[in-house]
Amino acid sequence: MSGHSKWATTKHKKAVIDARRGKLFAKLIKTVEVAAKTGGGDPAGNPTLADAIAKAKSQSVPNDNIERAVKRGSGELAGGVNYENITYEAYGPNGVAILVECLTDNRNRAASDVRVAITRNGGTVADPGSVSYLFNRKGVVLLTKAAGLTEDDVLLAVLDAGAEEVNDLGDVFEVISEATDLHAVRVAAGDADLEITSADISWLPSVSVPLDAEPAAKVLKLVEAVEDLDDVQNVWFNGDISDDVMELVSS
């Protein structure tokens, strides 16, 4: 996507579709469990866990499920799984760069499944480092655009927490920060009574590839096929899809 705004808009629209998928809960729970295992089960002392719990709750994951995931991760409950973070790099139709983030307990299965999904949909798995340099790891917070709320209001609320820029995306405000400042920005926004739509570590493209309707449809088909895999947590790509093209593809 060209710049941050179009990328966030596309992710925001896709999130509406993704939310209908039954696999979303499982992926969010896995993130909570891994965060608890890595940094402990107390969200007050583990910002990554606090963010994972907040995201799970925002998607209506039941509290009991979240609590069990925290306990499995922290060792209070048996049944915890050793998940591994793996990122795969690929090229899709029209040379679009793709990053695939996985949390898996079976590296061989994840690699095979990702490769098959990519190649069957017109893509090619790339060597490590050949794609990732086209992206920057950032924190992205989306805020509901309440009546009377301006970009300046948002910037004032989150600037001291590490916000780098605020963008007006139409129905939401997007706040960009360093990935390490995501939690602080989310907390600052909450303290200012701003309604948080989402808060995620994101790979934002520094170089984009403009896509018309036909290649956009092919790229999105590939992305959705990869996202459907159980081991896949996130898929990022640098296709620049305008609102008009997105409407054509979605219709």
UniProtKB/Swiss-Prot annotation:
GO molecular function: DNA binding
SUPFAM superfamilies: YebC-like
Subcellular location: Cytoplasm
Gene3D superfamilies: 1.10.10.200, 3.30.70.980
Keywords assigned: Cytoplasm, DNA-binding, Transcription, Transcription regulation
Cellular compartments per GO CC: cytosol
Pfam families: TACO1_YebC_N (PF20772), Transcrip_reg (PF01709)
Entry's Gene Ontology BP terms: regulation of DNA-templated transcription
Main location: cytoplasm
HAMAP family listed in its UniProt record: Transcrip_reg_TACO1
Family the entry assigns: Belongs to the TACO1 family.
Protein name: Probable transcriptional regulatory protein FRAAL2138
Naturally occurring in which organism (per UniProt): Frankia alni (strain DSM 45986 / CECT 9034 / ACN14a)
